[in-house]
Amino acid sequence: MSLTREQLAQQIVDAGRFLYGRGWSPATSSNYSTRLSPSEALLTVSGKHKGQLGLDDVLATDLSGNSLEPGKKPSAETLLHTQLYSWRPEIGAVLHTHSVNATVLSRLTPQDFIEFEDYELQKAFSGVSTHESRVRVPIFDNDQDIARLAAKVQPWLEAHPDCVGYLIRGHGLYTWGAQMSDALRQIEAFEFLFECELKTRSVMNRQG
């Protein structure tokens, strides 16, 4: 049974309160979305505090990122959300967060990816059934030109259909799922892994 627009908007509001409460979406940073229809998405409007969202703080867009609601301004990063809905029709929710761990780890990693292996919590990601796997998370350099950034992301997505998320350097994390609960689960898993990685590097640096 399909959810109504109001139910989907409430999911976004609830996600904002949860993610703000965990410190992963401070102030007016971050943006969230759900799929509204095969050709439409419901996204947070620009400039709103994510811990204080209301049902009117979302708007519908087409999959080219154009607002379908006059008077409401979509986030500058809308295209990165709609790109994912166009890429895989089974994606039902996309979350973009600005946590300290994601920001710092992406800045400290000189490579264009980070890889996680042998962590039990990798099984929290869709399609991963064992810790004996590798989860590679690409890191793209930040770019204020979102269309140009999306053009860099697209080839990775096409070459890695099992991708579960990506980082923007010094900026934050994008992840997604079939529904909002899946995307939220993956946010938590990523944050756990990011913290483990940072602590591991800290210990190794002290030992070195």
Swiss-Prot record:
It holds the Pfam family Aldolase_II. It catalyses: 5-(methylsulfanyl)-D-ribulose 1-phosphate = 5-methylsulfanyl-2,3-dioxopentyl phosphate + H2O. The gene is mtnB. Disulfide bonds: none annotated. Binds 1 zinc ion per subunit. Catalyzes the dehydration of methylthioribulose-1-phosphate (MTRu-1-P) into 2,3-diketo-5-methylthiopentyl-1-phosphate (DK-MTP-1-P). Belongs to the aldolase class II family. MtnB subfamily. The keyword Signal does not apply. This is Methylthioribulose-1-phosphate dehydratase. GO terms for cellular component: cytoplasm. InterPro entries: Aldolase_II/adducin_N, Aldolase_II/adducin_N_sf, MethylthioRu-1-P_deHdtase_MtnB. It comes from Pseudomonas fluorescens (strain Pf0-1). It is an enzyme of class 4 (lyase).
